[in-house]
Swiss-Prot record:
NCBIfam families in alphabetical order: PRK00029.1
GO molecular-function term, one example from the UniProt record: ATP binding
EC id: 2.7.7.-, 2.7.7.108
Taxonomic source organism: Methylorubrum extorquens (strain CM4 / NCIMB 13688) (Methylobacterium extorquens)
InterPro entries: Kinase-like_dom_sf (IPR011009), SelO (IPR003846)
UniProt-recorded name of the protein: Protein nucleotidyltransferase YdiU
Keywords: ATP-binding, Magnesium, Manganese, Metal-binding, Nucleotide-binding, Nucleotidyltransferase, Transferase
Length: 497
């Protein structure tokens, strides 16, 4: 019989100080909550075998599968601006890598027991955070945003002790890699240039193979990471996503959203929104995410200085030149995304101001971010040049002062006259850019409460079904598109895992 996972491991071939070898710790009574069968097929795996007793034992960390070389990766990181020279995988174990339809992917267990980097922790994960990451990462994938994926969630039959006793769980996470900005910082902080070079060469081979042919491969690697992060954060903003804990150890060089601990989505639009209970000063607020991304990338550039050039002055110049490109790349991606949300297929000089005026009006009038843009798509002028009155009223109703929307909408309709194409095509373009369904924070909390307190996973399954088609109208699930009463004010998230 073939192996459950056809592992082809590369990170485990790196020097031994890149990680600690550690096996998952067995649990009492593993039970499969859900297997992502479609993802399993994409990875070249047999979903029926993964759902078998043997497969569930592997997904729970009960059994180490053939070909696995389990390890916990070492990394450092800035956490809320403060540097910690050693962090590492404290509750996650990389089983190995497989090569599927979309290339090489890591298979990692989160919550599978203590590692050399657990820092007195138990290495376990609670059920609520596991379900949150499964749900939100799969929702982000459906939204078209680069992200780690969830292959499976398993309950352990054990409790984990946090503020209270909670049911334990294990998440099987899939990622293009788990190399972080903090991975490079780990070696830079130790003056380990050879370790830094080995990691960079591995990253180039895995994520930027064309960089190997560049005049300065390490500058090309840095450019690639900057480009991917600029595009990623722009996409976050266009769907109202707030990561919540953008520490350098939570930034993937692959350009995927990773580590969903205290994540959330905007309800009422306010760029100062920060939901995380530990982000007391709003460092990682919604509107601050581009600035923090650049701050993190600057830390990456600093770590790479010894590789950019043997001449320190030249190395700094290379780093600064690379970092200078972030703003333009982010702005192009962000405003391009906003133009799509407004039904604008072409670009004009005044477009950023038009979008900015709408966002300002939304903030002043406490309008819901997702609903405003979705309903705007139904309020585009028709073939006769006039919008549907009912559709216009549906948008206006979201604003405290509907006339404020009217004042903005006049300029928007004038701008639409510059566009070619008919109203139906424009409406379709906007529907593809403006989701009807996001993981509404209150719905996520209801789902977690049902699972943790009543062992009821039906809300989890329903949300997964709805969020798999975020851009489609789903009349039977219309309630899942609605914001909470009060616009979600006072909502708080917790790292949890």
């Amino acid at each position: 019989m073939t192996a459950l996972f056809p592992f082809d491991n590369s990170y485990a071939r790196l020097p031994s100080h890149f990680f600690g070898r550690v096996a998952p710790t067995a649990v009492e009574a593993p039970r499969l909550i859900r297997l992502n069968r479609a993802l399993a097929v994409d990875l070249g795996l047999d979903p029926d075998r993964l759902e078998s007793p043997e497969g569930v034992e592997v997904l729970a960390g009960q059994r180490v599968p053939e070909g696995a070389e389990p390890l916990a990766a070492a990394y450092a990181g800035h956490q809320f601006g403060q540097f910690v020279p050693q962090l590492g995988d404290g509750r996650a174990i990389l089983l190995g890598e497989v090569v599927g339809r979309d290339g090489r992917r890591d298979i990692q267990l989160k919550g599978s027991g203590p590692t050399p980097f657990s820092r007195r922790g138990d290495g376990r994960a609670a059920l609520g955070p596991v379900l949150r990451e499964y749900l939100v990462s799969e929702a982000m994938h459906a939204l078209g945003i680069p992200t780690t994926r969830a292959l499976a969630a398993v309950t352990t039959g054990e409790q984990v002790i946090r503020e209270t006793a909670l049911p334990g769980a294990v998440l099987t996470r899939v990622a293009s890699s788990h190399i972080r900005v903090g991975s490079f910082q780990f070696f830079a902080a130790r003056g380990d240039v050879e370790g830094l070079r080995a990691l960079a060469d591995h990253a180039i081979a895995r994520h930027d193979p064309e960089a190997a042919r560049a005049d300065n491969p390490y500058r090309a690697l840095l450019d690639g990471v900057i480009r991917r992060q600029a595009a990623l954060v722009a996409r976050w903003l266009t769907v109202g996503f707030i990561h919540g804990v953008m520490n350098t150890d939570n930034m993937s060089i692959a350009g995927e959203t990773i580590d969903y601990g205290p994540c959330a989505f905007l309800d009422t639009y306010d760029p100062a929104t920060a939901f995380s209970s530990i982000d007391r000063h709003g460092r990682y607020a919604y509107g601050n995410q581009p600035r923090i991304a650049l701050w993190n990338l600057t830390r990456l550039a600093e770590a790479l200085l010894p590789l950019l050039s043997e001449d320190e002055t030249q190395a700094v110049a290379e780093a600064e030149a690379a970092l200078t490109g972030f703003a333009g790349q982010f702005e192009a991606a962000y405003h391009g995304g906003l133009n799509c949300k407004l039904g604008l297929a072409t670009t004009r000089d005044g477009d950023p101001a038009l979008a900015g005026d709408l966002l300002k009006t939304m903030a002043e009038n406490e309008a819901d971010f997702t609903l405003t843009f979705r309903r705007l798509g139904e309020a585009v002028p028709g073939p006769d040049g006039e919008p549907d009155p009912a559709a216009v009223e549906a948008v206006r109703s979201l604003f405290i002062d509907p006339t404020a929307y009217d004042r903005w909408a006049g300029g928007w309709r004038r701008r639409l006259k510059d566009e070619a194409g008919d109203a139906a095509a424009r409406r379709q373009m906007m529907r593809a850019a403006n989701p009807a369904f996001i993981p509404r924070n209150h719905r996520v909390e209801e789902m977690i409460t049902a699972a943790v307190e009543r062992q009821d996973f039906a809300p989890f399954e329903t949300l997964l079904t709805v969020l798999a088609r975020p851009y489609d109208d789903q009349p039977d699930f219309a309630q899942y598109a609605e914001p909470p009463e009060g616009g979600g004010r006072g909502y708080r998230t917790f790292c949890g895992t």
